C-alpha cells in the first residue's frame, strides 16, 4: 500500500502548493491564476480517481457486489469520452468509437464506467507521442458483449503480459513514474469484470503496434431489458 499512499500524497501536495502560491502572490495576473486553478482541478480529479479506486478495491475485497441490471455501453462511453476529452486533447490523442446498439451488458452503470474509464485513461497515458489514438469498439459476439480498447502506444512487452492484471504491478517502473498511477487500475478492472462472470485479456494491437484490451461481459437478455 506504500505506492498507493505515495500517490495520494502527491496530488495533495500539489494542491496545497498551488493554493499557497495564489494566496501569497499579490496582484497575480488573471492568466497565471487561471493556469494555477486549472492545475488544482487536475490534481483534485487525480486524487478523486485514486480514492475511488481504493474504495472500490475495498468493496471488491469485502465481497460487496451490487445486483446487476442491463447497461447500454454506448451512453456510458460517451460520458467517459467527455470526461477524458481534455486530457486526450492535451496529449494530441484522438478518441474514436463504434458501439452497437445491441451492446447491453448485464452489470451496473458503475461497473461499465470504471472499466471504460480505467482502460481508456491508461490507453491515453501510453499512447504514441505523435498522432496518438484510442479506439473503443463494443459489439455482441457469441452471446456476450465484447468491448475492445486499442491504442497505438509503446505496447506491453511479452514478458509483462501475464502480470499486468496483478495488483500494484506496473510495466516499466521508470515509465510508470512519468505518467503516474498506483498499479491498481487494471487489477480493479479485472476483478470487476470477473465479478460479473466476464473475462479480460490483453495483447498487441494491429500489426503489433500498441495494445488491445478485450473485455467480455454477459449480455443482458431481452426479458432483463424489459
Regions found by a protein language model. Name each.
Residues 23-30:
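Short acidic helix/loop segment immediately C-terminal to the autophosphorylated histidine
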Residues 42-47:
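Short alpha-helical segment of the dimerization/phosphotransfer core of two-component systems
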Residues 62-71, 75-76, 106, 128:
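Short flexible loop/turn segments at helix-to-beta-strand junctions
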Residues 69-70, 89, 94-104:
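Conserved catalytic submotifs in the C-terminal HATPase_c
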Residues 197-199:
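Conserved glycine-rich
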Residues 123-124:
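Short helix-loop "hinge" at the ATP-lid/N-box region of the Bergerat-fold HATPase_c
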Residues 156-170:
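Short conserved segment of the HATPase_c
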Amino acid at each position: 500500500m506504500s505506492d498507493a499512499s505515495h500517490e495520494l500524497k502527491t496530488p495533495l501536495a500539489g494542491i496545497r502548493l498551488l493554493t499557497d502560491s495564489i494566496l501569497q502572490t499579490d496582484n497575480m495576473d488573471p492568466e497565471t491564476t487561471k493556469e494555477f486553478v486549472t492545475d488544482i482541478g487536475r490534481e483534485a480529479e487525480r486524487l478523486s480517481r485514486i480514492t475511488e479506486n481504493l474504495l472500490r478495491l475495498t468493496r471488491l475485497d469485502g465481497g460487496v457486489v451490487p445486483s446487476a441490471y442491463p447497461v447500454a455501453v454506448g451512453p456510458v462511453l460517451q460520458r467517459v469520452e467527455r470526461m477524458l476529452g481534455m486530457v486526450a486533447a492535451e496529449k494530441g490523442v484522438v478518441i474514436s468509437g463504434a458501439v452497437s446498439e445491441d451492446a447491453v451488458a448485464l452489470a451496473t452503470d458503475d461497473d461499465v464506467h470504471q472499466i471504460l474509464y480505467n482502460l481508456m485513461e491508461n490507453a491515453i497515458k501510453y499512447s504514441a507521442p505523435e498522432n496518438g489514438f484510442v479506439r473503443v469498439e463494443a459489439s455482441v459476439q457469441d452471446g456476450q458483449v465484447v468491448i475492445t480498447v486499442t491504442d497505438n502506444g509503446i505496447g506491453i512487452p511479452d514478458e509483462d503480459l501475464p502480470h499486468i492484471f496483478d495488483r500494484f504491478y506496473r510495466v516499466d517502473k521508470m515509465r510508470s513514474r512519468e505518467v503516474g498511477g498506483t498499479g491498481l487500475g487494471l487489477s480493479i478492472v479485472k476483478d470487476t469484470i470477473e465479478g460479473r462472470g466476464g473475462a479480460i485479456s490483453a495483447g498487441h494491437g494491429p500489426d503489433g503496434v500498441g495494445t488491445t484490451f478485450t473485455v467480455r461481459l454477459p449480455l443482458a437478455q431481452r426479458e432483463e431489458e424489459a
